[in-house]
Curated annotation (Swiss-Prot):
PROSITE patterns from the UniProt entry: MTTASE_N (PS51449), MTTASE_RADICAL (PS01278), RADICAL_SAM (PS51918)
Entry-linked CDD domains: Radical_SAM
Any one annotated GO CC term: cytosol
One GO term (biological process): tRNA modification
Keywords carried by this UniProt record: 4Fe-4S, Cytoplasm, Iron, Iron-sulfur, Metal-binding, S-adenosyl-L-methionine, Transferase
Enzyme Commission code(s) on record: 2.8.4.4
Location(s), subcellular: Cytoplasm
Name by which UniProt lists this protein: Ribosomal protein uS12 methylthiotransferase RimO
PANTHER family linked: RIBOSOMAL PROTEIN S12 METHYLTHIOTRANSFERASE RIMO (PTHR43837), RIBOSOMAL PROTEIN US12 METHYLTHIOTRANSFERASE RIMO (PTHR43837:SF1)
Organism encoding this protein: Treponema denticola (strain ATCC 35405 / DSM 14222 / CIP 103919 / JCM 8153 / KCTC 15104)
Signal peptide: none
Chain segments annotated as coiled-coil in the UniProt record: none
Length: 467
């Protein structure tokens, strides 16, 4: 499995591994021994497309005896083109209904030589899947996993191809999600990161719960899900990743503040602080409205004396959008400084065919967009460093991901604190002696939860000592 793209794609890769194992295939990390190499691709922006295509070319060149299957978003979006223009791919499989993968595998690996002429290279089912299934192999570090709660998106931001690739919004049933969490808890998992194209839209798709059902519960679909999760017994943490700001459900805040297993970490992709650009992106919000959301979040946790202290925000900014002027960009910088997120990701605009913004006028020169990206990243760096410095001297819990042996009898571990999401944020470098134990009294190892005191900051990472 050669994985590309986002956390949603990672869950798909894990589901595919489960399907393949049910077909009696064995997963291997060594491509030299593979009969089949699956490139689970990303098709979101141009750089990701190029990376995925190159992965297919490299896999076929390095392992000519293996068959190469292109799966994922690139396959979903461009199957009709790639089945002719990418002969290195022996098979192409969309992500609309993963349960149909065995059909394509049977075609790629016919039981009789005479069946070769009947091979169907491409299978792109309609977007009807809702991301459930067995995941025997988790591609994260120990005791942490992603839980996908939705597929598709109904927001139709003018720059975004996700609705084209993933289709309209579909929500997993609450029971299905809770049962999956319970299954992982039995396997000693600790951290669950809820993901989807937009968590705020959970249970608002046309085939989801009716408005009458949600009205009867007097809450949003996401709040209803969090209420159900809060009833699950056990020691675990829940992190919410990607909540669209235009319909942020404030009714989740009382649920989260009442249960410390919900981490006060909010991933809200604002994209811009300029009203004109926000509207051009087909979004309904405004900088002052977005800041009010953050104010509500911070006040909710402050009033309840949260053991975590201040909630932390991650966001995303897209610069160089068509028509973005220097004045517009300065409004975004101003918004960022008022927002004060701990983390933010920055990207330059990628012109994607079939999206509304593809035909927008006012193209921003590449050098200008890159200069704006550098400026917003520098502004964020200053904010991040100050916020990380505020943790120095405080005690936190660290989820250990891997061990690194240092000199003498001192050991190092890499891990994450509650305000660090997997892969995208900084890390905690943990110093400890062999006699130190984790919170369960066991030797410190990958997957351990360790109490530690923050001693220093090193760039975007923190240095800590086990206590």
């Amino acid at each position: 499995m050669d994985l590309h793209g986002c956390a949603k794609n990672q869950v798909d890769a894990e589901l595919i591994i489960g399907i393949m194992e049910n077909l009696s295939w064995k997963n291997t990390s060594d491509p030299d021994e593979a009969d089949l190499i699956i490139v689970n691709s990303c098709g979101f922006i141009n750089s990701a497309k190029e990376e995925s295509i190159n992965a297919v070319l490299q896999a076929k060149a390095a392992h000519p005896k293996a068959k190469v299957l292109l799966a994922g978003c690139l396959a979903e979006r461009y199957a009709d083109i790639l089945k002719n223009d990418l002969p290195e791919a022996d098979g192409i499989f969309g992500n609309g209904n993963l349960s149909l993968l065995p059909q394509l595998i049977d075609s790629m690996f016919p039981k009789k030589t005479s069946d070769e002429k009947f091979i169907e290279k491409t299978l792109v089912p309609p977007q009807i899947g809702i991301c459930g299934g067995e995941r025997p192999k988790i591609l994260n570090f120990p005791r942490s996993t992603y839980i996908k709660i939705t597929e598709g998106c109904d927001n139709f931001c003018s720059f975004c191809a996700i609705p084209i690739i993933r289709g309209r919004l579909r929500s997993r049933p609450i029971k299905d999600i809770c049962d999956e969490i319970k299954t992982f808890l039995k396997k000693s998992f600790y951290e669950f990161n809820l993901i989807g194209q937009d968590l705020a839209a959970y249970q608002t798709g046309k085939d989801d719960l009716s408005e009458d059902e949600l009205h009867r519960e007097n809450c949003s679909g996401l709040a209803l899900l969090l209420k159900s999760i809060s009833k699950i017994k056990g020691n675990f943490k829940i992190r919410l990743l990607y909540i669209h700001p235009d319909h942020f459900p404030l009714d989740i805040l009382p649920i989260m503040t009442a249960d410390k297993r919900f981490l006060p970490y909010f991933d809200i992709p604002f994209q811009s602080g300029a009203q004109k650009i926000i509207r051009a992106m087909n979004r309904n919000g405004a900088a002052e409205v977005y800041l009010d959301i953050i104010k509500n979040i911070r006040e909710a946790f402050e009033k309840t004396n949260s053991p975590y202290g201040e909630p932390q925000i991650r966001t995303t900014f897209l610069v160089g959008f068509p028509g973005e002027t220097d004045e517009d960009f300065n409004e975004t910088i101003k918004f960022l400084k008022e927002l004060r997120p701990l983390w933010s990701g920055g990207f330059t605009y990628s012109r994607e065919e079939d999206t509304p913004s593809y035909s927008f006028k006012g193209k921003v020169p590449k050098k200008t967009a890159e200069a704006r990206l550098a400026e917003i990243q520098n502004a964020q760096t200053s904010i991040t460093e100050k916020k990380l410095d505020s943790f120095i001297g405080k005690e936190i819990e660290v989820l250990v991901e891997e061990l690194i042996q240092a000199e003498d009898k001192t050991f190092l571990a890499l891990g994450r604190a509650w305000f660090q999401a997997p892969e995208v944020d900084g890390a905690v470098v943990l110093n400890f002696n062999l006699n130190k134990k984790d919170i369960d009294g066991n030797p410190i190892a990958p997957g351990s939860i360790v109490k530690a005191r923050i001693a220093a900051r090193n760039g975007f990472d923190l240095e800590a000592v086990a206590v």
